C-alpha cells in the first residue's frame, strides 16, 4: 500500500499508522525468511552438519543488538530506531545478491526464488517506512548511516557445492535471525512511542 495516494497534497499519515504498517511488513518479512530458511534446510542441508558451523557467523554481528526483550527495553528509543535502520541497511546488498545467486543453485525451487525476490523488495519498503518514522520521531535526523558491510558474495559463488550451500545456509539463517530481531524491536518501539508503554 502506498503511504499516500499519488497526487495527494498535504497527505499526513499518523505515526501510529506508519508503525502499524512497519510492524505488519516486518512480521511478513520474518515469516518469509523463516519459510525460506526451513525450505532450504530441508532440501539442501540435511546430513551436512551446517547448523553446528553456523553459530555467530552473521555479517551484522558488528552491530551490537540487545539479546532479549529486557535488554531492548533498556535502550533509548532513538538508539533502537537507529539500530533497526542499521540492520535493514546491512541487508540491502546481501539480499540483492541472494536474488541473483540463488537462481544458480541446482534445481532451486521456484518458491525459494520467489521468496528471495519478495524479501528483497519488502526489505526496501520497510527501510523507506522506517526512514519516514525516524524523520517523524527525530525531525531533521535520518538516522546515522552506520551499517555492516557484507563481504559474502564470493562464498555464494564457490565452485565447491558443499561450501557454497553452507554460505547460502548461513546467510538465510542470519536473515531469519535478524528479521526476528527487527520484528521484536518494532513491536517494542510501537508500544513505547504510540501506546506510552501500555502493552
From Swiss-Prot:
Gene3D superfamilies: 1.20.1250.10
Residue stretches in coiled coil: none
Source species of the chain: Alligator mississippiensis
Record GO terms (molecular function): hormone activity
The UniProt record lists the keyword Disulfide bond: yes
Source species taxonomy: Eukaryota, Metazoa, Chordata, Craniata, Vertebrata
Protein name as it appears in the record: Prolactin-2
Listed InterPro entries: 4_helix_cytokine-like_core, Somatotropin/Prolactin, Somatotropin_CS
GO terms under biological process: positive regulation of cell population proliferation; positive regulation of receptor signaling pathway via JAK-STAT; response to nutrient levels
UniProt keyword annotations, A-Z: Disulfide bond, Hormone, Secreted
Disulfide bonding pattern of the chain: 4-11, 58-174, 191-199
Amino acid at each position: 500500500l502506498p503511504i499516500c495516494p499519488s497526487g495527494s497534497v498535504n497527505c499526513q499519515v499518523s505515526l501510529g499508522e506508519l508503525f502499524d504498517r512497519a510492524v505488519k511488513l516486518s512480521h511478513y518479512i520474518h515469516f518469509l525468511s523463516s519459510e525460506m530458511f526451513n525450505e532450504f534446510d530441508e532440501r539442501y542441508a540435511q546430513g551436512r552438519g551446517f547448523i553446528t558451523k553456523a553459530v555467530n557467523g552473521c555479517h551484522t554481528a558488528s552491530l551490537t543488538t540487545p539479546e532479549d526483550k529486557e535488554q531492548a527495553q533498556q535502550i533509548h528509543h532513538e538508539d533502537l530506531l537507529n539500530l533497526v535502520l542499521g540492520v535493514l541497511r546491512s541487508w540491502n546488498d546481501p539480499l540483492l545478491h541472494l536474488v541473483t545467486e540463488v537462481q544458480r543453485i541446482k534445481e532451486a525451487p521456484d518458491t525459494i526464488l520467489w521468496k528471495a525476490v519478495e524479501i528483497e523488495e519488502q526489505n526496501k519498503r520497510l527501510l523507506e517506512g522506517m526512514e519516514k518514522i525516524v524523520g517523524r520521531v527525530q525531525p531533521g535526523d535520518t538516522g546515522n548511516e552506520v551499517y555492516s558491510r557484507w563481504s559474502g558474495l564470493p562464498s555464494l559463488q564457490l565452485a565447491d557445492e558443499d561450501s557454497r550451500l553452507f554460505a547460502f545456509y548461513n546467510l538465510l539463517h542470519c536473515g531469519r535471525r535478524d528479521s526476528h530481531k527487527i520484528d521484536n524491536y518494532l513491536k517494542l518501539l510501537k508500544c513505547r512511542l504510540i501506546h506510552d508503554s501500555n502493552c
